[in-house]
Amino acid sequence: DLFQVIKEKLKELTGGVIEGIQGV
């Protein structure tokens, strides 16, 4: 399912962003 893949990529992206904010 394409939507599922997009959702997973988005989750991965936001997860990295949150990690970056917490790292600072």
Swiss-Prot record:
Expressed by the dorsal and submental skin glands. It is found in: Secreted. The keyword Nuclease does not apply. Transmembrane segments: none annotated. GO terms for cellular component: extracellular region. One of its GO terms (biological process) is defense response. The keyword Secreted applies. Keywords: Amphibian defense peptide, Secreted. This is Citropin-3.1.2.
